[in-house]
UniProtKB/Swiss-Prot annotation:
Belongs to the alanine racemase family. Catalyzes the interconversion of L-alanine and D-alanine. May also act on other amino acids. It comes from Clostridium tetani (strain Massachusetts / E88). This is Alanine racemase. GO terms for biological process: D-alanine biosynthetic process; peptidoglycan biosynthetic process.
């Protein structure tokens, strides 16, 4: 399809991304949308995805680590960007240089940021992280933490921009624990307000809470997987939000051969033809993020609006499929590894179910040696080659 690329690519449909953002805007009713673009926008390509999100309702961006934020700044993104995770002391000055908002979950971290900010004559914008029941980073919801947060709020050159927490099980049908977390979060926010601490944005609603619990939206929400067209679990109310998967993973057939009955295919000789078969080779493997486990789990691809099974172990750079039941298969025919075609589906959802994992992991697995091809109105509007 693209003469200047290897015949494996991730196709990113920007029209579907815009559609998903419109759905999110409709359900969030004017809240600040903090678009989560960590892990290279869940594998979709943060540099190309972020501008579209900002044009279509996102007011802020969130990443996991500082280098992701710096990449966006160097790419011309000037919207507020927060780092959700840990940043080493040695990188605080760099963070301030790029005007990145840092997460703070101890007085000591805030003090270090303050000292660097004073020396560099900058104001450090921070977000206070609370551990309301996830067991990760964050101040615990107790009086001691209130005192520490109050104390750090008085540090020079520190500006508290927001306060946030993360739900452990908002994607489950039983919302009891989520409500417990939310109540702890509100208790801390209210306690800080009573101490005179002004916080601009409270944000705790993730993708699942955005869908199921509008009362938890507060000033800001943090959509992640739903922007990319997938639901956080099968237990959320899918009727509240219509989503379209944004990414497809595609390749082309590079070799076809007839194989007699009783011939082995791939490493370990695990697959043996039970009859005369037509076997096609695809130039994609686990180094591209196409999991080696898919063969053992009954993985299939889409070819000519039909499913074809993977045969033999998936190699690092190649895999094989049985196309005996499909007519007129030729070298160069397009194959959908992840996606759908006229109702035939093998999306990240189906692949995740086969692998016993989640759709998040499937899209994030697609490696950097797979070019991202951006489509709008059916036309290619951009290609990002990482290697």
């Amino acid at each position: 399809m693209f003469k200047h690329l290897r015949p494996v690519w991730a196709e990113i449909d920007l029209d579907k991304l815009v559609y998903n953002m419109q759905q999110i805007k409709n359900i969030c009713k004017g809240r600040e949308i903090i678009a989560v673009v960590k892990a290279d926008a869940y594998g979709h390509g943060a540099l190309d995805i972020a501008p579209i999100l900002l044009e279509n309702g996102a007011t802020r961006l969130a990443v996991a680590v500082l280098n992701e934020a710096i990449e966006l700044r160097r790419g011309g993104i000037d919207a507020p960007i927060m780092v959700l995770g840990f940043t080493p002391d040695s990188l605080i000055e760099t963070s301030l240089k790029y005007n990145i908002e840092q997460t703070v979950y101890s007085y000591e971290i805030a003090k270090e940021i303050s000292e660097v900010a004073v020396k560099s004559n900058r104001v450090a914008k921070i977000h206070i992280a609370l551990d309301t029941g996830m067991g990760r980073i964050g101040f615990l919801p107790d009086k001691e933490s209130i005192d520490k947060i109050y104390k750090l709020s008085k540090l020079p050159n520190i500006q508290i921009e927001g306060i946030f927490s993360h739900f452990a099980s908002a994607d489950e049908q039983d919302k009891t624990y989520t409500k417990l977390q939310f109540n702890k979060f509100l208790w801390v926010c209210n306690s800080l307000e009573e101490r005179g601490i002004d916080i601009k944005i409270r944000h705790i609603a993730n993708s699942a809470a955005i869908i199921d619990m509008p009362e938890l939206h507060l000033e800001g929400v943090r959509p992640g997987i739903i922007m990319y067209g997938y639901y956080p679990s099968s237990e959320v109310n899918k009727g509240k939000l219509d989503l379209k998967p944004v990414m497809s993973l595609k390749t082309t057939i590079v070799h076809i051969k007839n194989m007699e009955k009783g011939k082995y295919i791939s490493y370990g000789r695990e697959f043996k033809t039970e009859k005369e078969s037509i076997i096609a080779t695809l130039p994609v493997g686990y180094a591209d993020g196409y999991s080696r486990s898919l063969y053992d789990k009954g993985g299939k691809i889409i070819l000519k609006e039909q499913l074809a099974p993977l045969v033999g172990r998936i190699c690092m750079d190649q895999c094989m499929i049985d196309v005996s039941h499909i007519e007129d298969v030729k070298i160069g025919d397009e194959v959908i590894l992840m996606g759908e075609n006229k109702g035939i589906k093998m999306t990240a959802e189906e692949i995740g179910n086969l692998l016993g994992t989640i759709n998040y992991e499937v899209t994030c697995m697609i490696s950097k040696r797979v070019p991202r091809v951006y489509i709008r109105d059916g036309n290619i509007v951009g290609i990002r080659n990482y290697v």
